[in-house]
A protein has these predicted regions:
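C-terminal regulatory/interaction module of P-loop NTP-utilizing enzymes
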Residues: 1-167
Length: 167
């Protein structure tokens, strides 16, 4: 065919499109047979290691990368009954959410993240982020352990202990 309306398409032109599967109930429509016979449909899965390599090359927030390493199933957790789902594309959008200060800033940050990945994933990420940002400076801790003030927050204590075990 190689026509788009009245325009003849070059033999060197390739058109690449993406879409969702009908069975995912994500707003996709069944492709007509005529169109299906003119396309190659290639299913693919996303892999955390691939996404992390891409994310590092594209300056995605390091805390977000660490969160997804901690909770790998959160990279892509599609549920057709939810309005918003965590997907690789949605996590990229989360990385663009600016940080805000103060209690209202945390609420605003959470709301914006929830708008991208849904409430459950946002709650998990925001809790991880808050804990991670409160971890001690480990180079300082190792250089002067006697001056280290033990955190009162048990989750920060636990994360600090786990980090020290890994060193």
């Amino acid at each position: 065919d190689r026509w788009a309306g009245s325009v003849k398409l070059s033999d060197q032109l390739f058109i690449i499109a993406t879409g969702n599967r009908v069975e995912d109930k994500s707003g996709a429509n069944r492709m007509c047979t005529k169109l299906g016979n003119r396309l190659r449909c290639l299913p693919f899965d996303e892999y955390l290691d691939d996404w992390i390599a891409w994310a590092k090359a594209h300056n995605i927030c390091a805390v977000l990368i660490k969160f997804l390493q901690f909770q790998p199933k959160m990279l892509s957790d599609f549920d057709p009954t939810r309005k918003t789902n965590p997907t690789p594309r949605a996590w990229e959008a989360v990385s663009l959410v600016p940080s805000f200060t103060g209690r209202d800033g945390e609420k605003l940050f959470h709301a914006l993240v929830a708008g991208d990945v849904g409430e459950g994933a946002a709650a998990a990420y925001c809790a991880f982020r808050k804990m991670y940002l409160n971890l001690p400076d480990f180079s300082e801790l190792l250089a002067r352990p006697e001056q280290y003030a033990v955190p009162e927050d048990l989750s920060i204590r636990w994360a600090t202990d786990m980090k020290l075990v890994d060193l």
